[in-house]
């Protein structure tokens, strides 16, 4: 994928940035695509950098993701909780699976969805081959992760754990309005009022 370059005029002349670095200057982190260890490490590094720059200023995490590896997503989530800077989450396009979990884990009152975004929650997926004992061990770990994710999402949404358990048994799709009623987001936005943009 070709990453666009942005050229800016400064007092010292021209500076060029790749688009993601330019967004980082405005404290915007973009999480696009499937969440794996490489993507997770990039997002974590950006969050830690912005925390070091200004621990009191909001960070805006834009999410357009089908989900991904649970441990990679949990690493991002734990970093969001670890840093002092409030992390606002914004769904653009879709936030599914671990993407929806991260969306719900943003700062209360600062979790958003754009008008036509979709959100989907479900239970963790897993596949493992090997000896019966090892398969059993991995199945137990997936069940432990499922329980933990449901408990955390219940905490963020205000829904009972039992409802999360029932709703995540299968793919559960929501519009922005549905996600707002569910407690995954706080507001639906159609214009940029959160990072100072205007049109």
From Swiss-Prot:
Any single biological process term in GO: protein quality control for misfolded or incompletely synthesized proteins
Pfam families recorded: CLP_protease
Matching InterPro entries: ClpP, ClpP/crotonase-like_dom_sf, ClpP/TepA, ClpP_Ser_AS
Cystine connections: none
Catalysed reaction equations from the record: Hydrolysis of proteins to small peptides in the presence of ATP and magnesium. alpha-casein is the usual test substrate. In the absence of ATP, only oligopeptides shorter than five residues are hydrolyzed (such as succinyl-Leu-Tyr-|-NHMec, and Leu-Tyr-Leu-|-Tyr-Trp, in which cleavage of the -Tyr-|-Leu- and -Tyr-|-Trp bonds also occurs)
GO cellular component: cytoplasm; endopeptidase Clp complex
Catalytic site: 97 (nucleophile), 122
Subcellular location: Cytoplasm
Keywords: Cytoplasm, Hydrolase, Protease, Serine protease
EC category name: hydrolase
GO molecular function: ATP-dependent peptidase activity; ATPase binding; serine-type endopeptidase activity
EC number, UniProt record: 3.4.21.92
Its job: Cleaves peptides in various proteins in a process that requires ATP hydrolysis. Has a chymotrypsin-like activity. Plays a major role in the degradation of misfolded proteins.
Similarity field: Belongs to the peptidase S14 family.
HAMAP family on file: ClpP
UniProt cross-references to NCBIfam families, sorted A to Z: clpP (TIGR00493), PRK00277.1 (NF001368), PRK12553.1 (NF009205)
Subunit architecture: Fourteen ClpP subunits assemble into 2 heptameric rings which stack back to back to give a disk-like structure with a central cavity, resembling the structure of eukaryotic proteasomes.
Protein name: ATP-dependent Clp protease proteolytic subunit
């Amino acid at each position: 994928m070709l990453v666009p370059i942005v050229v800016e005029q400064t007092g010292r002349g021209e500076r060029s940035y790749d688009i993601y670095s330019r967004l980082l200057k405005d404290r915007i982190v973009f999480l696009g695509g499937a969440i794996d260890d490489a993507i997770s490490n990039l997002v974590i590094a950006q969050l830690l950098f912005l925390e070091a720059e200004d621990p009191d200023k909001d960070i805006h995490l834009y999410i357009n993701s089908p989900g991904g590896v649970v441990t990679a997503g949990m690493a991002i989530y734990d970093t969001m909780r670890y840093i002092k800077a409030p992390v606002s989450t914004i769904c653009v396009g879709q936030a599914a699976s671990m993407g929806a979990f991260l969306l719900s884990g943003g700062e209360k009152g600062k979790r958003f969805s754009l008008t036509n975004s979709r959100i989907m929650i479900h239970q963790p997926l897993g596949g493992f081959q090997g000896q019966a004992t090892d398969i059993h061990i991995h199945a137990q770990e997936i069940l432990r992760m499922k329980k933990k994710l449901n408990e955390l999402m219940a905490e963020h949404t205000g829904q009972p754990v039992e409802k999360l358990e029932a709703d995540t048994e299968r793919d559960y799709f929501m519009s922005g309005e549905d996600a707002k009623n569910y407690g995954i987001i706080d507001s639906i936005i159609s214009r940029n009022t959160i990072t100072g943009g205007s049109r």
